[in-house]
A protein has these predicted regions:
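Non-catalytic accessory regions of SAM-dependent methyltransferases
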Residues: 1-34, 40-42, 46-49
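Conserved AdoMet
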Residues: 32-86
Length: 86
């Protein structure tokens, strides 16, 4: 599965659980999963994910769908276009 499709599916899962900003959250969790920034995610959306990364991504999506904050899941606090480590 490629990055774009995984993000879309993750966003749909979050949206169905009424999580606000589901697309952004899905992108941030993907970036955390593959240890890249959002710019890389957007520019390389057709790259294929390995099974380990895909499973880790869906674990984060599941935790987010249960209400865990993105900052807690990523250990980063995102503020506009930059972040700081907690």
């Amino acid at each position: 599965m490629n990055i774009n499709l995984a993000i879309s599916q993750g966003s749909k899962i979050l949206r169905n659980k009424f999580i606000p900003n589901s697309q952004l959250d899905s992108e941030i969790l993907m970036a955390k999963t593959i240890n890249k920034d959002r710019k890389y995610i957007l520019l390389n959306s057709n790259n294929i994910l390995n099974n380990n990364d895909l499973n880790n991504f869906y674990e984060l999506i599941e935790k987010r769908s249960l209400g865990n904050p993105v900052a807690y899941l990523t250990n980063k606090k995102f503020l506009w276009n930059w972040y700081r480590h907690k």
